[in-house]
A protein has these predicted regions:
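Enzymes that bind and transform nitrogen-containing heteroaromatic metabolites
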Residues: 1-159
Length: 159
């Protein structure tokens, strides 16, 4: 299982259910990388999707303890149930939000992290993989600048 997330310099990922600074290059990378895959997403993150619509060209699994019905999403009540539902799928990505990342990180072996080199007001953070002994930065796929903000798309793998 893999995950994909954009983080700021302090590993912040969001504020009040949204990304304070969203780069179009990161969104393009997200779409390209997750297309045709299964995505596991939390209820609050789905609430930030336009019209709460499922992501196109992906199997969408909603991870929620609540009995939530959202058209286009399959419901899993636990990380283990989400894993069982996606067993056999070629690629499975955890796409947030903060609670889902924390629950699913121990089950992931690879992480695509877009490091956005700035800070923004955040109330949600991703664990700093540079400080975790069981994760290693293996590759930088892309570096760039957008609207005066530099970024790096990095790959981390579990040791």
């Amino acid at each position: 299982m893999e995950l994909i997330v954009a983080v700021y310099d302090d590993w912040g990922i969001g504020c009040e259910g949204d990304q304070p600074i969203a780069l179009s290059a990161d969104r393009k990378f997200f779409r390209k990388t997750t297309a045709g895959s299964t995505v596991i997403v939390g209820r609050k993150t789905v609430g930030s999707f336009p019209g709460q619509a499922p992501l196109p060209k992906r199997r969408n699994i909603l991870l929620s303890r609540q009995d939530t019905t959202i058209p286009g999403f399959e419901l899993a009540h636990s990380p283990e149930e989400a894993m069982e539902m996606s067993r056999g799928d070629a690629r499975v990505f955890v796409i947030g939000g903060g609670t889902v990342y924390r629950q699913m990180l121990p089950m992931c072996d690879k992480a695509y992290i877009t490091k956005v080199h700035t800070t923004a007001p955040c109330d949600t953070w991703f664990p700093n993989l540079d400080e975790l002994e069981d994760w290693v930065l293996t590759e930088t796929l892309e570096s760039g600048e957008e609207s005066g903000i530099t970024y790096d798309v990095c790959v981390y793998e579990r040791k």
